[in-house]
Amino acid sequence: MCAVFEVPRSNYYAHCLRAERVDEQRLLLRKRVNELFVQSRSSAGSRSICDMMWQQHGIAIGRFKVTRLMEESGLVSKQPGKHAYKQATVERPDIPNMLNREFAVSAPNQVWCGDITYLWAQGRWCYLAAVLDLYTRRVVGWALSEHPDADLVTKALDMAFEQRSRPEGVMFHSDQGSQYGSRRFRQRLWRYRMQQSMSRRGNCWDNAPMERLFRSLKTEWVPSVGYMTRREAMQDVSYYLMERYNWVRPHQFNDGLAPAVAEEKLKTVSGIS
C-alpha cells in the first residue's frame, strides 16, 4: 500500500502511533467541562464555562475549544423561552422613577432593586421576592411565601437591611406593584431612611436587572415540574441566590466574575469598607 501511494513506511507507522495515542489533556478538559455543565443543571454555555474554568480551576481556555468539547460530549445549554412581563394598571405619580435606568452605580448600598416572581411548589403557586444591589448585581435579600403581599416584600427588605449591616441613604427601586406602594412597605423604607423609586407603568426595562435575575433562576435552575414541597423550594432557591448566583455563576456585567466575588475585588481595589 505504501509503495502504491509512494509513502515511506516510517510515515505510515508514525501515523498509526499518533492515532492510538490518547490525548490525556483533552480528556481532562472534557471532564472539567462536563462537571461544570452538570453543576449548572445544564444551563451553562461556552462563555460561562470559560469563565468558571479559569476561576475554579485556573485553566485558560477559549470559547471555541469549549464549544467543541461540549459538542463531543453532546452537551446542549438550556435556551430560555419567551419571557412575559407583568404590567401595572395604575400609575403612581407620587413615587417618581428617580433611578431612570441609571443601573451603573459607584459603590455598594447606593441602589437596591426589588421584584416578585412566582414558583410552583407543593401543587400550588408560591411567590418569591428578592432584593438586588446594583453595584455588582449581588442578591442581598429574599423571601418566599404563599401570598404575594406587602409582608412578603417587607421580609425580603428586612433580610437585605440586616445582611448589609443596616446601611442608610439607600435608594430602593421597584416596579409599580401594589406591594411596594403599600403603607406597610413604605413605612419600613422610612424607618430604614431609604428613598423610594418606581418604574413607569408597564415598562419592564426600568427594572431590567431584576427581570434578568428571575429569568436566570427559572431557565437555569428551577425544575421544569416545580418543587415537591415548599421546604425543598426554600432550600433550593436559597442555594441558588445566595451561593451559586452570588459566588459561582459568572456575570457579564462583572466581566465574568460572580457578583459577590466582583464586589470583594472592587472593595479591595477601591478601599471601600
Language-model-derived ranges and their functions:
Residues 1, 79-84, 144, 172-176, ...:
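RNase H-like polynucleotidyl transferase catalytic core
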Residues 1-5, 12, 33, 49, ...:
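Mobile genetic element proteins and their domesticated derivatives, centered on retroelements
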Residues 2, 9-107, 203, 258-267:
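Basic, flexible linker segments flanking DNA-binding modules
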Residues 21-22, 39-42, 56-59, 103-105, ...:
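Conserved, non-catalytic sequence blocks in retroelement Pol enzymes and Pol-derived host proteins
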Residues 88-90, 174-176, 180-185, 198-218, ...:
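RNase H-like two-metal-ion nuclease catalytic core shared by retroviral integrases
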Residues 101, 105-140, 146-147:
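An active-site-proximal beta-strand-loop segment
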Residues 124, 143-165, 171, 181:
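Active-site beta-loop-alpha junctions of metal-dependent nucleic acid enzymes
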Residues 190-194, 216-273:
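C-terminal domain-tail junction helix/linker
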